[in-house]
Swiss-Prot record:
Upper classification of the organism: Bacteria, Bacillati, Chloroflexota, Dehalococcoidia, Dehalococcoidales
Residues that hold IMP according to the record: D13, E14, G15, K16, N38, A39, G40, H41, T128, R142, Q223, T238, R302
NCBIfam families referenced in this protein's UniProt entry, alphabetically: PRK01117.1 (NF002223), purA (TIGR00184)
Organism name: Dehalococcoides mccartyi (strain ATCC BAA-2266 / KCTC 15142 / 195) (Dehalococcoides ethenogenes (strain 195))
Biological process according to GO: 'de novo' AMP biosynthetic process; IMP metabolic process
Similarity comment: family membership: Belongs to the adenylosuccinate synthetase family.
InterPro entries reported in the protein's UniProt record: Adenylosuccin_syn_GTP-bd, Adenylosuccinate_synth_dom1, Adenylosuccinate_synth_dom2, Adenylosuccinate_synth_dom3, Adenylosuccinate_synthetase, P-loop_NTPase
Chain positions recorded as Mg(2+) binding sites: D13, G40
Pathway recorded for this protein: Purine metabolism; AMP biosynthesis via de novo pathway; AMP from IMP: step 1/2
Residues involved in GTP binding: 12-18, 40-42, 304, 330-332, 412-414
Primary residence: cytoplasm
Function of the molecule: Plays an important role in the de novo pathway of purine nucleotide biosynthesis. Catalyzes the first committed step in the biosynthesis of AMP from IMP.
Location of the active site: D13, H41
Assembly and interaction partners: Homodimer.
Protein name as catalogued: Adenylosuccinate synthetase
Amino acid sequence: MPVTAIVGGQWGDEGKGKVVDMLAQEADYVVRFSGGDNAGHTVINPMGEFKLHIIPSGVFYPGVKCIIGNGVVINPDVFIRERNELISRGVDVKNVFISDRAHLVLPYHILLDGLEEEARGNKSLGTTRRGIGPAFVDKYARMGIRVGDLLLPEYLHERLEYVLECKNQILTKVYDAAPISLDEIYETCLKWGKELAPNIKETTHIIEEAISQDKKIIMEGAQGALLDPDFGTYPYGTSSSPLAAGGCLGIGIGPASVSATLGVFKAYSTRVGGGPMPTELLDKTGDIIRDEAHEYGTTTGRPRRIGWFDAVAGRFSCQINGMTTAIMTRLDIMDILPAISICTAYELNGKIIKYFPANSGELAKCKPVYEEMPGWLCSTKEVRCYDDLPLAAKNYICRIEELIGCQMSAVCIGPSREQTIYK
């Protein structure tokens, strides 16, 4: 089957956007399957640098159809703004479609996200405050408004009336905030419906036909496996599954249709927001890596937390995704380091463990067990053949492959398409 899932192997920000952009030139479809505009993908190509939050990274190829699947929650304002910016920069967006089953991020979701984070105080989860979590809560509480509802004014009004009655009770009585106007939000939704009507499709049928015609489909993941609500650092995670299995649910296909799962790993670890991170570097080395790599969130602008590569977490990520191959990004950032460490195990309560604990409290107590490897202290940015990489760099890649149990099919040594080395 011609479906390839591309997923993040860490806490997000691994470089999936570049990988999708790179592989999309041979694809017929690129489909986003999870998350919302809380995830940011940076793509650098001959047209310039683009920061995408909701539109799939395959949009830069005119022949590729890009679908935002039912598993994504969509803020129409963000989609419209992103679409219009792409158009203004000469990108053809006529092949961008949205599933009518996808749920909406509405103004009250954003408002509640901020109020809930404020109420948590120093126990806040570090959300992006873009309303993603509350939108998924409504989806599973059967209070959500879906994209297709925008095209059915009477049904939309009925749904909004019911939902706002509940939301305004929470806003006024729990948070002492002003209520949301039904008329205002209804008018906003009607405007969105007119604006999005050409993009809204019954996408499961489109994808089913594509599979039957043996078309090449990329399932584009958002965020990373270690943020999964079941297998990640709960509750410090995201609200939808970024795993390959989540891709099947998020676009409407069966697992047998997926022929390959490609995991994307940085050569080191990063994380945004709260939650345990065993290999976090709070010293000068972390600052050096952050500055060299410009590690600041695409969506939030917050400085990312930096750590050494965590092979325990990486192996777990390979397992729960069923990765068939992987790609390492940002190897070039390690060029400046005289020595590099890899976490091969954890020490928990005086015992050495090689598994990823389910409990975030336990994970926070884990001390990394490191294996130190020599750096190479020379630039890899201009290398175009794997054999021409410094021996120490190849040894580093090989050791990570051994530890996570998955082979790297390519290594990225810079942001552009040309800075990708295939093994």
